[in-house]
Amino acid sequence: MLALEVFDGYVSWLRDNVPHAYENLAPPATPAELDALERHLGYHLPAEVRAVLAVHNGQKSTDTAEHTEYATPCLPTLSLLSTTLIRECWDRWNALRDTPDIEQLQDMGDVFPGAAGLVKPLYSSPGWIPLWSDPINADYIGLDLDPDVRGTTGQIINFGRDEERHFICAPNYTSLLQILLDEVHTGAWPATEMETELPDGSWADLPWFGAPDDHFFNALYGRFKAQTT
């Protein structure tokens, strides 16, 4: 499977260039864990997503909007979510869709030029499955299993609290992994440190992946914009 070949290339690069991130990769997800996730979501995951999770089920330690573990992200500026955290993040948004003001929130959703008719102009959808997460904010890169009329099931999009305007990150997960591998080979995403406030109020420089003032969302949007303008 091409996705596994590309992901293996990325993991090899990670081992050689960002060892703190490599050491934070989690063991494989079991078939039972993957099946349970699909039942909970009510969607079948693309084979390439299952295959990658069956190699590394996210990270050993992970930072998300709900969890602070002072972890080195396994992706440039982003956390690689496990089956458990995919479910937890999806549940948070599923609960939001049950709130009385959901219609007002849905009206906040929009798409960038070039994504009209491909991604639904919503704030949230049960068919949006988070795979990669911002370590601090509830913002995600993930599967779109509920595309608009001209979209493709399994396309990769941005969504979340501050990502209410959507674009196509990649046509599928394999393509997203190839973008990831291409990006790290540019040298733009080195092993770095980030000044972080600890629970006792002190500050420390902790291992990080990518420039502290940059974000992988920007790289993905830059590629989308270049293709649509």
Language-model features and meaning:
Residues 1-136, 192-196, 210-229:
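A surface-exposed partner-binding patch
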Residues 30, 79-82, 154, 172, ...:
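Helix N-terminus capping/helix-initiation residues
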Residues 55-56, 132-134, 144-146, 159, ...:
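Structured loops at beta-to-helix junctions and adjacent beta-edge loops in soluble globular domains
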Residues 139-166:
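Low-complexity, glycine/alanine/valine/leucine- and proline-rich hydrophobic stretches
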Residues 153-155, 185-190, 207-210:
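A short, hydrophobic/aromatic-rich structural module that often spans a beta strand
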Residues 157-164, 208-213, 222:
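Secondary-structure transition/turn motif
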Residues 163-187:
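Compact, glycine/acidic-enriched structural inserts
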